[in-house]
Amino acid sequence: MSRVLVIGCGGVASVAIQKCCQADTVFTELCIASRTKEKCDALARKLEGKTKTVITTAKVDADDVNQLIQLINSYKPDLVMNIALPYQDLTIMDACLACGVNYMDTANYEPEDTDDPKWRAIYEKRCKEAGFSAYFDYSWQWAYRKKFEEAGLTALLGCGFDPGVTQAYCAYALKHEFDQIDTIDILDCNGGDHGYAFATNFNPEINLREVSAPGSYWENGHWVEIPPMAIKREYDFDQVGDKDMYLLHHEEIESLAQTIPGVKRIRFFMT
């Protein structure tokens, strides 16, 4: 049995919440919290009679650490699932540390204000040292490792599909299928069609930031950076068909470069 606080009630969060409610023997109690409580209430009503999970809702501004601490201390969850925006990763991690609660998210931190002088100075130093210039990277959250270890807490980062399932596939392949993995290509395909000319795969602002950033990939121990969407490939996806896809920077490249010994190249493509 577990009590989980989910922060966020957008497209990704609503899917995750419904999946949790399907496993109601595991997720016995769930609190859905968002800046817009009405969205949380609407989802809770939609799930009435479809799950044994006890669902409550709350209003919270995830940019405000004090509000987060108050909510976490009030609800007393075993785990906080951060399925809000990546801008709020650090405030939610700080709140979890203050309250002694485990943490999980789906995407790594990036700042909302990329012109902030303090952040900019650290970012420009990282660009020179690491060799890629995307606004999002794991360095900010990996810096919390020691704090969580010393507190006896777990922080699981990037637990969506990509990042998330993609790394699990790679780890499984290395453990059970291969003695050595030299190259990894991750192909992210959206096969849906709602009749419109354009739609993002997730939060529009984050998705547009991602595709407009310089692309980068890992090769022979270092980053190679290219102009945005400069490398295009076509791939015949099973049950979907031919799709154009473009090389992007993506956070799981960072973690896979550290966790797959001897890997020579890692790339990420999105349709």
Q: Which sequence ranges carry the predicted segments?
A:
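N-terminal Rossmann-like NAD(P) cofactor-binding module of classical short-chain dehydrogenase/reductase
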Residues: 72, 78-82, 103-105
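C-terminal catalytic/substrate-binding lobe primarily of soluble NAD(P)-dependent oxidoreductases
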Residues: 175-271
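Helix N-cap at the beta1-alpha1 junction of Rossmann-like dinucleotide-binding domains, i.e.
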Residues: 36-39
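Glycine-rich Rossmann-fold phosphate-binding loop(s) that bind the pyrophosphate
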Residues: 9-10
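N-terminal Rossmann-fold NAD(P) dinucleotide-binding loop
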Residues: 13-14
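Rossmann-fold cofactor-recognition segment
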Residues: 49-64
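Rossmann-fold NAD(P)-binding glycine/threonine-rich loop
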Residues: 107-153
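Conserved Rossmann-fold cofactor-binding substructure of NAD(P)-dependent oxidoreductases
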Residues: 61-77, 88
